[in-house]
Amino acid sequence: MLISLDFGITITDILRKKDDGTLIHQMLPTNQKPSEQFIQELFKDLDLKEEVDRIALTGGHHQLIGEEIDETPVIHVNEVDAIGEGGLAVSKLDASKPAIIVSSGTGTACILAKDGVFTHCSGTGVGGGTVLGLSKLLLNTVDPQEIQDLANKGLAKGTD
């Protein structure tokens, strides 16, 4: 099994890739700095040493974690590279052509992908954190899954 965590300012994204290729995605509000103990608690249902091949980390403060947890290798990924590689993979864009990858988290980052190099070229502080704040005020929830479920029921025609 492979595990990846993105420690965002507002949300921590967790992705498990099982040996059969099944992906399990989970989002949690970020309420503490990353630590080995926090990761062990997240995966208390697993024997990290026996069941997990490696753990990949990115996002804020990922560097607080060492190079292994319970003898499982930890890979640290620069967030700009993670956004660039992930954006190209998800979009299926031709990596030989320049592209701008946009990631909306607590803020919004614009990453230039060109010649195999990823560069932060622009961004704004408005992003997912703004959505969470508005959701708390208007919907009385900050649960990302509940917000997503409500958004899926909405009609985009009514937006500007």
PLM feature segments, named:
Residues L2-D6, V52-A56, P98-S103, G123:
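Short glycine-aspartate micro-motif
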Residues L2-Q37, E41, F118:
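Short glycine-rich, Thr/Ser-proximal phosphate-binding strand/loop in the N-terminal lobe
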Residues D6-I11, G60, V102-G107, G125-G128:
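A short acidic Gly-Thr/Ser loop motif
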Residues K17, I111-K114, L137:
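Short beta-strand-to-turn element immediately C-terminal to the catalytic PLP-Schiff-base lysine
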Residues I24-T30, D45-E79, A113-H120:
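Short beta-strand-loop/turn "lid" adjacent to the catalytic site in phosphate-handling enzymes
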Residues T30-Q40, I65-G66, I83-L88, P98, ...:
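Helical "lid/coupling" subdomains associated with nucleotide-phosphate turnover
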Residues I75-V102, G107-G116:
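Conserved phosphate-binding catalytic cores of ATP/NTP-utilizing and phosphoryl-transfer enzymes
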Residues V117-D160:
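Glycine-rich phosphate-binding loop plus the immediately following alpha-helix
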